[in-house]
Regions:
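Noncatalytic, beta-rich nucleic-acid-contacting surfaces in large DNA/RNA-processing enzymes
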Residues: 1-252
């Protein structure tokens, strides 16, 4: 389902379900990923094809070069072996595809820009490889990226974060019940916090709009909700995010 672009739910939630079943999710990796998402034992490597706007030709070059000459040992090694546009290199850096072999994202983005500028000044525009002329190595000041920066880059490039979305709240809260608590509160009004999975629009016999929602609690378990017309008007669901939900617990 992941390699087919998802199904009823977005790709994010099939990956989430794999994690809940014990899978260890790894973002795209320059030495371990292929075009499609792949399972190695319990580890799931997301495929390069999930990266927004990454060119198919770039994916093909990476896989062919890796097959022909083995794994990449450093960013400089990668740069010297492949001819890839700066935009695609930056996408790979921002998704942390080089995390097993090299510097932080900030340092690599600087290196990529420097190499690209050096390449543009070369006289021979028809050479097969971008970086055959050695680029002088420099000692870089360590500039570690923050997990929240990685998460927002993943949201832009993959369409979803690779961490629990509740970790992205400015003021994280442990208030509210969890899905596992709800059976003990049948008939009571409770509050929960939920990350929106999907929302279904429908109408009453009087043509008033109402909603059926599905959310994840902070532990990753599903909560189903019904939003009656008056509540739908007063508290519209406006898009992806984490919602504070208050309502009466009902048992199906």
């Amino acid at each position: 389902i992941i390699n087919n672009g998802g199904g009823f739910y977005r790709t994010e939630f099939y990956i989430h379900e794999a994690r809940m079943q014990g899978g260890e999710i790894e973002g795209p990796c320059i030495n371990n990923s292929v075009a499609e998402t792949t399972l190695y034992g319990k580890t799931i490597y997301l495929g390069f094809s999930l990266i927004k706007d990454l060119q198919a030709s770039t994916i093909q070059k990476i896989l062919e070069e890796r097959k022909a000459r083995g794994a990449f040992t450093s960013f400089h090694d990668f740069s010297s072996r492949l001819s890839i546009g700066l935009d695609d290199v930056n996408r790979l850096i921002r998704i942390r595809a080089f995390r097993d072999i090299e510097y932080s994202k900030t340092e690599l983005l600087w290196q990529a820009q420097r190499i690209d500028q050096a390449t543009k000044h070369r006289d021979d525009q028809h050479q097969q490889r971008m970086f055959q002329t050695p680029i002088q190595q420099v000692n870089l000041v360590e500039l570690p990226s923050l997990p929240v920066e990685d998460a927002f880059d993943a949201m832009e490039l993959l369409g979803f974060p690779l961490i629990n979305p509740f970790e992205l709240i400015a003021n994280p809260t442990k208030a509210g019940l969890l899905a596992k608590d709800l059976p003990n509160h049948i008939g009571k009004v409770v509050s929960v916090y939920g990350y929106l999975v999907t929302i279904k629009n429908t109408s009453t016999i009087h043509r008033d709009r109402m909603l059926f929602g599905t959310f994840l609690d902070r532990e990753g378990y599903f909560i189903d909700t019904t939003h009656f017309p008056e509540i739908t008007k007063r508290y519209p669901v406006i898009g992806r995010g984490i919602y504070h939900l208050t309502g009466k617990v009902a048992e199906e």
